[in-house]
Each structure stands twice: as C-alpha cells, then as structure tokens.
C-alpha cells in the first residue's frame, strides 16, 4: 500500500462518452495492472476488430476477476500520481450506475466527469433525459465539489481538435453547473482523447492551443478532505461477507470517528453488538481505521444474517440514529406531474436505499433566498424547493446533514429516475434496543 495520501475518485458521465476508456488509460499508464492482463485485453479487442475497445475489455476483465474473486475487493481500481494514491470507486457502465453513483458518490472525494465533444453525443448528454445533467446534479447533492471535467473525443469534433467546440462545451457546462450552485472557479476542464492518452498523462501534440495542465496534473491539484476523527464513529456498510475460518466481515468506508481493533461496536438499525477482531484495507492489516479508509473488518458476536448493506456501525455509547421520521430540504429535479402527501419514493442515503413516505409538505421555499414562500403546499412540482417530512417504511439510519454530512444527504428515486435530492435538517429518533 502506497505511503502517499489517499483519495477516492468516481468517474461519471453519459453512456458511451468514454468513461471506461479514460479509466483504462489511467490504470494502464499509472496503475497496478500487470502486463499479462493488458495483453489479454488487447488480444480480445483485436479479435473483435476493436482495437480502441481494449480499455473497456481491460475493465471488464478486472470486473470479472472481482466478481469471481474470493478476495474482499476493496482494491477496486487503483493508480498513483506524483502526489496521491487513488482508488476509483465503481467503474462505470452498470445499469445500476445511478444507484451506485449515489452510494458511490457519498464515498468519493472527487469526480471526473467525462463529456464527449462529438456532435450529437454531447447534446444527448445535456438533454433533459441526459446523464451528463443528471450526474452533475447528483454530484452536487452528494457534496462533490471537487470536479474535473474531461472533454473527451476531441479527435472526433468537426474539424478534429476544434478549440471553438471545446470552448462552447466549457461555457455551456459551466453555466449549467452554476445554476445548481457549483462554484465553477473550482471546476477544472481539460480537452482529452482517451484512447490515445492526449492530455491525460502526457501533453497533446494535436491541441497546441491548450496550454493548461493535463488530467493527471489536475488530479494532483485536488485537496485532501478534512478528517472528522473527533466526531462519533459512523461506518455505513457496503457489503457483508462470511469467510470460512475468519467469520463475519462487513465492508465499508469510515465516514467519521476512529475504529480500533478490540472496539465494541453496534450495528444499527439492528441493534446488534459485536467486537472488532481485525481490520484491513487493500489487503493490509491495520490497528485502527480513520475517515476515508475503505475497510473490511472481522466482527465477533455478529452473524452475516444479522446485518446488511445500508446498516451503520457506531460505538454503543453514541449509536447511529434510527429515524422514526425525518425532515429534509429537497429540490424536485424531475417529475412528470406533481408530488403530494403520501408520495413514496426510494430514498438513497449513504449505502442504504429504503422507501420513505412523504408524511407532510411543511413549506415551499423561494429557491433564490431560501425563505419560506408558502406554508403547507398541496403539492410540489419539478423545480420546487421545499421542506418535507418523510417516514421510512423500513428501519433506516440517517443523521442531520450539519452533524454528519455523508449520512444526511440523499437522492429520491422513482420510475428509474432521480426525482429529487435533499439534505436532512432534523431527525425524530426511533427507540431501538441495543442487544
């Protein structure tokens, strides 16, 4: 495991804009992929006559290895730059990608948004149905302020490597981001050609008009997030394994506090108590884990069937909050008609996804000022900002956003789409017995 500081990175963007190729390029140039795997991917791509697809094949190979593998794969995808050690969480291309992005984004420290500059592709991504738009909105909700936009496929613009097209995309995407509250002075743009690696790890000979940093240099300008070590322990569980000869091994990322070997811990909402026998990250044993660490930990006294993805770990003297009801400030991002009391979307918060019923529309807010514009509105429609109360249908752990940001921001999904996004301003706790 590298001694460099570690950052979690997510790669987002519209389908077919070149996410896999970009990730493959980074991993090949700076990653931990052995030559053999690269050769196999190249041969598989050649057989199909798709030389340029070798990166996507490479990722598929890694994904298969991951799915077949018995190892707890927190290795995800790793690469190093001069300054940092990166883990790419959730390689793209999943049909559950938005769902994964919601849970993944809540663990990410930074994002690369891949946008194709090719005529028609860029426009599709920015259309109302487009994922470029959807992912920008979700990145904002999930608190991802560190964003690098890789404007890809610059070799396919008309004419190729067209500076005018690049500038037009930078302007439009920046404008859209500003409308959702991004500080675009902090967003970085770079024109790239992923298969060839132009402006990714080396300067492009084809775009002399661009003299800014490469993607890799931008990655080194990212900032490390503050580590909330002095806050109470919170670890949203991503997966639970039962490993023969070892026992129960939950996997997740420490969001706040410190977990030490020997600690007594509680899993909420189940209320199950166990003791930490060992902790590891990227196959390296550790005595303690801090915020930002992706870990697997072996627990004595808890069985795999007792706990699941979406549970949250804390210490018994300050257990994670189970919500009877919670109040949130939401923005309705998409809805064909209107939503009223009783509406029940699926709430995706940290690694959990639970249906929650709207129990009260408290007020509608003026989006510009945040002041109350209407008390107890009858319904909400697309574009509305409101204070709403939700009642979870099944036990759910959430926290106030200002106390534990990663456990207090969420997305509302329905009909396969993101309906809204929000942050939790208040939680009415449910009584749970800790046993």
UniProtKB/Swiss-Prot annotation:
Residues 152-155 are annotated as: G4. It catalyses: GTP + H2O = GDP + phosphate + H(+). GTP binds at residues 13-20, 90-94, 152-155. This is Elongation factor 1-alpha. Mg(2+) binds at residue 20. It is an enzyme of class 3 (hydrolase). Residues 69-73 are annotated as: G2. Residues 193-195 are annotated as: G5. Transmembrane segments: none annotated. Keywords: Cytoplasm, Elongation factor, GTP-binding, Hydrolase, Magnesium, Metal-binding, Nucleotide-binding, Protein biosynthesis. Belongs to the TRAFAC class translation factor GTPase superfamily. Classic translation factor GTPase family. EF-Tu/EF-1A subfamily. Residues 13-20 are annotated as: G1. It comes from the Archaea. Pfam families: GTP-eEF1A_C, GTP_EFTU, GTP_EFTU_D2. Residues 90-93 are annotated as: G3. Its EC number is 3.6.5.3. It comes from Saccharolobus solfataricus (strain ATCC 35092 / DSM 1617 / JCM 11322 / P2) (Sulfolobus solfataricus). One of its GO terms (molecular function) is translation elongation factor activity.
């Amino acid at each position: 495991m590298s001694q460099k500081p570690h950052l979690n990175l997510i790669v987002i963007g519209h389908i077919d804009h070149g996410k896999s190729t970009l990730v493959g390029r980074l991993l090949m140039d700076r990653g931990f992929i052995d030559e053999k795997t690269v050769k196999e991917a190249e041969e598989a791509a050649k057989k199909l006559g798709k030389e340029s697809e070798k990166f996507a094949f490479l990722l598929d190979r890694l994904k298969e290895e991951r799915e077949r593998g018995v190892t707890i794969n927190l290795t995800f995808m790793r690469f190093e730059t001069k300054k940092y050690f990166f883990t790419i969480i959730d390689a793209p291309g999943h049909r559950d990608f938005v769902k994964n992005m919601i849970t993944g984004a809540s663990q990410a420290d930074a994002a690369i948004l891949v946008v194709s500059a090719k005529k028609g592709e860029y426009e599709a991504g920015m259309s109302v149905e487009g994922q470029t738009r959807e992912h920008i909105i979700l990145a904002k909700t999930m608190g991802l302020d560190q964003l690098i936009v890789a404007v890809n496929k610059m070799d396919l613009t008309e004419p190729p490597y067209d500076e005018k097209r690049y500038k037009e995309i930078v302007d439009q995407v920046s404008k859209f981001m500003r409308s959702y509250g991004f500080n675009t002075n902090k967003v970085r743009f770079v024109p790239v050609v992923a298969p060839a690696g132009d402006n990714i790890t080396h300067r492009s000979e084809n775009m002399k008009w661009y003299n800014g940093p490469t993607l890799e240099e931008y990655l080194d300008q990212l900032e490390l997030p503050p580590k909330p070590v002095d806050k109470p322990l919170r670890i949203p569980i991503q997966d639970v394994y039962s490993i023969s000869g070892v026992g129960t091994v939950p996997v997740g990322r420490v969001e706040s506090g410190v977990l030490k070997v020997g600690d007594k811990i509680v899993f909420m909402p189940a209320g199950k108590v166990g003791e930490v026998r060992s902790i590891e990250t990227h196959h390296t044993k550790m005595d303690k884990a801090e915020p930002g660490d992706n870990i697997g930990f072996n627990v004595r006294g808890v069985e795999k069937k007792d706990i699941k993805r979406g549970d949250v770990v804390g210490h018994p003297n300050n257990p994670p909050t189970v919500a009877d009801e919670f109040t949130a400030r939401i923005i309705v991002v998409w809805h064909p008609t209107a939503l009223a009391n009783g509406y029940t979307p699926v709430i995706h918060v940290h690694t959990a996804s639970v249906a929650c019923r709207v129990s009260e529309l408290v007020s509608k807010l003026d989006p510009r000022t945040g002041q109350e514009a209407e008390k107890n509105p009858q319904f909400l429609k697309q574009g509305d900002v409101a204070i709403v109360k939700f009642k979870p249908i099944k036990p759910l752990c959430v926290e106030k956003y200002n106390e534990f940001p990663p456990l207090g921001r969420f997305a509302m999904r329905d009909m396969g789409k993101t309906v809204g996004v929000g942050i939790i301003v208040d939680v009415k706790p449910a009584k749970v017995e800790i046993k």
